[in-house]
């Protein structure tokens, strides 16, 4: 394949992205879960800082009376939120929304099979959840940075308001907001892969992430911190059933956005020799592995969480994340054992 036939010279970048995925599915479940935990925590740190910065818009001279300056709030939120993904990429951690691109690229280049993708996606998604929950506990009951349980301060009240907005949207809207989000997140990751120096990578990441946050798109992993923080700070005025109402469709949308508009797009550009049949097969393969992942990593936990919520009410506030953390940890080890046995 001649380079002249490849638009924008994307073939070398796609190859690098695909190869970078290899350690992600060859690592042990303990390391994968820990790396996922760190990514969830990094994204949560970005969200925490964004709320602290955004609250400036609630006070004079930026606010008028009791009406806060919403455009300024969104701009400030977007301006500092990127520190989370910058830490994920530069420091090193495993973020599921980014792994949609990495593992899809590895599959397209035949470096990974279905089981490898499923293992990485499940482990990183579960680790992201655990890290996000830990940071939600950190800012409310453990440090009171966002106030007391049921008595949030200005930062906690803002988190509750954000969480309330997130769980109030309809499922189809959440799906499409998820597409837009991970389209931009993975463009940020793609751009950073095309830049060599650290400062350039930071800029390459910052602008797309600023855009997705300020626009108001939905990120499943960020929501794993934002909504549980709202659940705890509001003393269960927001419920786990509402959490899953958001996260399940957003996860689906994130997968479509990251795969179709980034991983698949650049694979298609990188290989002008592809036949229509090969293109269709790659899309079908993605849908198959994603649906399996979505059921096991998102729908089943949703069923568990909703059942506990209906049965226990407020008693499920801390029990749901505990049980789901155990589910993800055990699941990652079981899946890894199966992958290793067939490797």
Where are these regions (language model features)?
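Alpha-helical transmembrane segments and their helix-helix packing motifs
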Residues: 2-343
């Amino acid at each position: 394949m001649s380079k002249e036939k490849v638009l924008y010279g994307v073939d070398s970048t796609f190859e690098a992205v695909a190869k970078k995925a290899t350690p992600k599915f060859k690592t042990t479940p303990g390391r994968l879960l820990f790396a996922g935990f760190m990514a969830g925590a990094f994204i949560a740190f970005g969200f925490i800082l964004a709320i602290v910065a955004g609250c400036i818009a609630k006070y004079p001279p930026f606010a008028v009376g009791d009406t806060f300056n919403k455009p300024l709030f969104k701009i400030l939120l977007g301006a500092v939120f990127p520190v989370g993904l910058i830490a994920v990429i530069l420091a090193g951690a495993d973020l599921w929304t980014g792994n949609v691109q990495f593992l899809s690229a590895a599959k397209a280049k035949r470096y990974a099979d279905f089981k490898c993708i499923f293992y990485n996606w499940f482990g990183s998604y579960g680790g992201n959840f655990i890290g996000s929950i830990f940071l939600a506990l950190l800012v409310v009951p453990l440090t009171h940075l966002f106030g007391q349980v049921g008595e949030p301060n200005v930062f906690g009240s803002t988190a509750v308001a954000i969480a309330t907005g997130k769980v109030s949207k309809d499922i189809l809207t959440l799906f499409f907001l998820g597409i837009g989000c991970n389209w931009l997140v993975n463009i940020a990751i793609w751009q950073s892969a095309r830049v060599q120096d650290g400062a350039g990578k930071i800029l390459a990441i910052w602008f797309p992430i600023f855009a997705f946050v300020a626009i108001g798109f939905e990120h499943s992993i960020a929501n794993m911190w934002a909504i549980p923080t709202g659940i705890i700070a509001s003393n269960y005025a927001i419920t786990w059933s509402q959490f899953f109402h958001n996260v399940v469709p957003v996860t689906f949308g994130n997968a479509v956005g990251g795969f179709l508009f980034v991983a698949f797009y650049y694979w298609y550009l990188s290989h002008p020799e592809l036949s229509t049949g090969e293109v269709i097969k790659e899309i079908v393969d993605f849908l198959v592995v994603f649906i399996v992942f979505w059921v096991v990593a998102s729908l089943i936990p949703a069923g568990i969480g909703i059942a506990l919520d209906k049965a226990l009410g407020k008693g499920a506030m801390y029990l749901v994340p505990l049980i789901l953390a155990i589910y993800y940890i055990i699941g990652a080890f079981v899946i890894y054992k199966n992958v290793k046995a067939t490797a």
